[in-house]
């Protein structure tokens, strides 16, 4: 996993150039948004259990067959595995958001995910829908527009770009599952 700084250094080194111009401007922006980035990751990690359980409850409400006998989350064991997988996905999305780089998500979470789910008989459409629900909840928390009474204390300013960045990581998960 490379953070934004390491990526710029590796890129400049491979071309035998100094870091300057546009690279410095993007790093300056990354630093300026550092507190917002930390607050966004804190909002996700502090609300992880709610984000994941709401997503799983959402797919169960949308598709009641999932909780019926032979459904994807029928037994307690399957439900626990579904919640665990959701927390793992959210954790790696938060790592990627913190680093400003999706490589940790790609390398440690998404590689072979579709094949694993297929081998286990996990309904990929439902899994992708759960991730989409997590994406929406995360965007609301990051932009501090969630409707829950306890909103996260975040650094003032527009966090829509961070919500979009997190959304792109969730989209990568959805693509890997589908």
Curated annotation (Swiss-Prot):
Family from the record: Belongs to the phycobiliprotein family.
Subunit structure: Heterodimer of an alpha and a beta chain.
UniProt lineage: Bacteria, Bacillati, Cyanobacteriota, Cyanophyceae, Synechococcales
Membrane topology of the entry: Peripheral membrane protein
InterPro entries: Globin-like_sf, Phycobilisome_asu/bsu, Phycobilisome_asu/bsu_sf
GO CC list: phycobilisome; plasma membrane-derived thylakoid membrane
Keyword field contains Heme: no
Subcellular localization, as worded in the UniProt entry: Cellular thylakoid membrane
GO biological process, alphabetically ordered: photosynthesis
Summary of the function given for this chain in its UniProt record: Light-harvesting photosynthetic bile pigment-protein from the phycobiliprotein complex.
Binding site for phycourobilin: 50, 61
Organism: Synechococcus sp. (strain WH8020)
Binding site for (2R,3E)-phycoerythrobilin 1: 82
PTM summary: Contains two covalently linked phycoerythrobilin chromophores and one covalently linked phycourobilin chromophore.
Binding site for (2R,3E)-phycoerythrobilin 2: 159
Keyword vocabulary terms for this entry: Antenna complex, Bile pigment, Chromophore, Electron transport, Membrane, Photosynthesis, Phycobilisome, Thylakoid, Transport
Descriptive protein name: C-phycoerythrin class 2 subunit beta
Repeat in keyword set: no
